[in-house]
């Protein structure tokens, strides 16, 4: 194909306006579409700023003959004069002008693409990911990546203004026993030894605080080899930060300023600050989860006490600290739910471990219920009165282990709100969730593990329970939640070696494990450690909010699938036997 020669682009395809009429311009880009009207050919030329209509007349035979052979996605260089269009297109910013071509160079041809290069293309996701370089030509995805670049700059500017230093930390580190599985990298030089790719820069950023760097940040790739859900990726980006000589409120206040700046600059929205605080315990009681969506009601009600003496054993058997009977009431929306729809909701909550879904309906004073014959009138009325807010009611009840009840009702309230179109996607309800439990019980391992990570500072008044009553210990930890998604989380860190060792002991890590995995880290605590804390945002989730998408793949240039594969490159792939031998690995 031809080169550009001496021609160099003077404008982008989305820039030209009426004020540019009569200018000679040079544009370069891809052919969006072409229309041959016989004596006149129109070409829509596209780059990442937009589209300009190119007009080629038959009075210039050389250019006209070239233009007749042009197809979609050919790469062109066009030199011509800007003129006002006779038939204007108000759907695009350049719709008042066109360029009359005087010179046309085909820089490259193109095969027929396997997907349409337009935002409303409905190609299967697998095809889009295989040809991601074509998918990324779509204006929507390009705009998302531009906004991501702008967001990165805003974050850097804000943190720089607040005394932070951008410092890189190593990608090749030590495997750790806590959290998700590590991605391991075999060492060729050190036989039978492995590096781990970082799940976060946690230890290194704390060491930077011990080093006296005071304020650190990094926009960094992290890696977790875990089972993937819809909006999880095996490699993801964190906005990671750490601050010395701070407590919880200092970290939260600084980050409220960052959130306010990002949403104002990117979305044009004023986020009220200070952002409301809610304890973990309150969030679980009211919403059944630690990342509540506050844009709608349907709060959980605990009715365990009302039915603890009921003859209905499904309810009365749940009267202990690990079980409960709870419900949500959707009020006057009850008329939207037929028995058939309720049956579908029951099937839905069973996906969360529930054995069934009880319900009570009140319509114009008449009571219907799936459990009417099992409850006394007094019990039925007490449930209705304790939950009723509207004239009518539809109460959904779960009775089971607390985690099943919370998970089931939380998912149910979210589903109903979305099914009923009660969620305003242009509203952003932020909340800080604080006072998390320091530990959670892992039934698989039959022991307590750190809910966040093992370097989190316990609340001072709870340290006494660290080794004796782990369920009582609350953490100086905080998550920032928006519209039902956790977009960031952090904590104040332990800054005392004795307390850190006690934390490891509470996690049942042996002295050998502590020394092997964290010896270097605990050793650093012997040389003066400042109070410090930090926070990390999931950059991909943050971008989903900022651009308004519910698909994480819309904000990542080259995402993986839910099975952690890259359909574009074919990764992961088999490795040559010679390469395996060099790193001392033998496959079964």
Protein language model regions, located:
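Class II aminoacyl-tRNA synthetase catalytic cores and aaRS-like
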Residues: 1-588
